[in-house]
């Protein structure tokens, strides 16, 4: 079920399309910043740290609502895992393979919408799931021989990111009655905390190098990315809160 008027429905779809565009092209600036020495996990951490600072400065009451609402903590984890896994995966692996596995999201959306929202997947949702699975099969099946069943770290990150994204969108729908600024802050906090924790953990293992000394190139690039992601994530939480989970899933893979 869609919330609001037909105009609201169209605006929600447009907002989701903007967010989908962001997911489709964001790998490029992340790779450019990685070439300047900033690991994607640190990029994600810094981008969302800036977003959190802006949102808290503008709407400080959102902090109280997030802290007092345990269900929004799930959104924190889901949004954080989505951004950390996707941004890391597309910078270390084949972009097409990672994105295709990420966009198995309709499969997870159908399952999570049934479990958390009571939304049953109809024939159209089933066809979307089949389309997502067939697309992944085409990419993973080589020109000759058996499919590549042994997935590497980038592919696992794509899968994990897609599942987290589905949970993120379902939780946005489930928590549609919460304040929009609180939902946005939960998503931004997730990007900051989850990516930051992973960066510190993998840094201790020698996998993720620390950020380089400040330089105009990567600092300005990170700032620009932060404002882009603020708009994109606000668009996602607006659209996903107003459309059913299955509609959100199909718009996001358009």
Segments from the language model and where they lie:
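Glycine-/small-residue-enriched transmembrane alpha-helix faces in small-molecule transporters
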Residues: 1-42, 85, 130, 134-137, ...
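Structural signature of hydrophobic alpha-helical transmembrane segments
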Residues: 37-50, 88-106, 150-164, 214-227
């Amino acid at each position: 079920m869609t919330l609001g008027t037909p105009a609201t429905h169209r605006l929600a779809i447009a907002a989701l399309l903007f967010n989908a565009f962001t997911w489709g092209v964001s790998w490029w600036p992340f790779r450019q910043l990685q070439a300047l020495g900033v690991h994607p996990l640190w990029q994600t951490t810094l981008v969302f740290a800036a977003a959190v600072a802006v949102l808290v400065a503008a709407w400080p009451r959102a902090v109280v609502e997030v802290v007092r609402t345990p269900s929004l903590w799930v959104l924190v984890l889901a949004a954080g895992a989505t951004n950390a896994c996707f941004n890391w995966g597309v910078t270390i692996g084949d972009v097409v393979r990672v994105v295709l596995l990420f966009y198995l999201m309709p499969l997870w959306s159908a399952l999570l919408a049934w479990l958390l929202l009571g939304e049953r997947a109809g024939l159209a949702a089933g066809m979307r799931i089949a389309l997502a699975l067939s697309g992944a099969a085409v990419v993973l099946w080589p020109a000759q021989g058996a499919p590549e069943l042994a997935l590497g770290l980038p592919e696992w990150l794509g899968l994990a990111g897609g599942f987290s994204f589905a949970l993120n969108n379902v939780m946005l729908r489930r928590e549609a009655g919460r304040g929009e600024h609180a939902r946005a802050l939960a998503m931004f906090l997730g990007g900051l905390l989850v990516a930051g924790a992973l960066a510190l953990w993998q840094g201790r293992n020698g996998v993720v190098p620390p950020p380089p000394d400040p330089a105009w190139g990567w600092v300005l690039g990170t700032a620009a990315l932060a404002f882009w992601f603020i708009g994109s994530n606000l668009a996602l939480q607006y659209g996903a809160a107003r459309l059913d989970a299955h509609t959100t899933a199909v718009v996001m893979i358009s």
